[in-house]
Amino acid sequence: MATTKPYRVLLYYMYTTIENPEEFAAEHLAFCNSLELKGRILVAKEGINGTCSGTVEQTEKYMEAMNNDPRFDGIVFKIDEADGHAFKKMHVRPRPELVTLRLEDDINPHEITGKYLEPKDFYEAMKQEDTVIIDARNDYEFDLGHFKGAIKPDIESFRELPDWIRENKEILEGKKILTYCTGGIRCEKFSGWLVREGYEDVSQLHGGIVTYGKDPEVQGELWDGQCYVFDERIAVPVNQKEHVIVGKDHFTGEPCERYVNCSNPECNKKILCSEENEAKYLRACSHECRVSPRNRYVIQHELTEEQVAAALEKIEAEK
């Protein structure tokens, strides 16, 4: 019998009315701290979006309290077992939006959104020829893993997606549109925006990639790579049948699923690289970042000017 791990990570969201997000955030933070949870929760007038970790007992108490609050009636928690906390601290922050689209005329998913497809239906729809699959996440999320045949919008943040669609509308014309994201929250708005733009056949993966990977029937099939998550785990598996690595090392192009942030704090770009290349390239995405006086790798490892110069010389010699 499989042993249960001592911790859990909860992923959830709900579009619901929260009258005073600032007041709610302060009270909710105190509540989460009383349970000794750690995580990141965003609160807006339009609802709540959170990931938090704790022991089985702590997370049970949290879910029970949320389920007993009429504002969160019907909320769905996606649960991962874990060996420890997935966060260092607990943050609950009020925001103007749960996901940042910054539309002049905002989308209310209760009023307009794409058709919900359960994992099995989404799986079948992906195999149809007249279908286009749009990844509603950012480029670095796509690079770690995505559905086979999915289109990668060239965007660094969610708010860039509507403009990208308008600039590439010929891809979607006359097609059935499928869209997906990590847990479903971005697609609720994005698919609604597509419907408002006049696209008639728009569907979204209900519960997102996380739900798809746990579904006992599809078992994550047609997914390549891993799923990027916004906590200390960074990546979680999806496809239970086969593991295909799609990520490529920033420096060598070799298969890689290990993300680090560029050591120049002014850049902070997410790059895939091996431990070996992290050391070789001083965890910096470019020469400019390597020679930054604020290079965090150099500071962290207390490298001397001579050691940095030798590393730069070696990189130059191998070009």
UniProtKB/Swiss-Prot annotation:
Its EC number is 1.14.-.-. The keyword rRNA processing does not apply. It catalyses: uridine(34) in tRNA + AH2 + O2 = 5-hydroxyuridine(34) in tRNA + A + H2O. One of its GO terms (molecular function) is oxidoreductase activity, acting on paired donors, with incorporation or reduction of molecular oxygen. Residues 127-221 form the Rhodanese domain. SMART domains: RHOD. GO terms for biological process: tRNA modification. Keywords: Oxidoreductase, tRNA processing. The active site is at 181 (cysteine persulfide intermediate). CDD domains: RHOD_YceA (cd01518). It comes from the Bacteria. Catalyzes oxygen-dependent 5-hydroxyuridine (ho5U) modification at position 34 in tRNAs. Belongs to the TrhO family. NCBIfam families: PRK00142.1-3. PANTHER family: RHODANESE-LIKE DOMAIN-CONTAINING PROTEIN 7-RELATED, THIOSULFATE SULFURTRANSFERASE/RHODANESE-LIKE DOMAIN-CONTAINING PROTEIN 2. HAMAP family: TrhO. This is tRNA uridine(34) hydroxylase. It comes from Bacillus cereus (strain Q1).
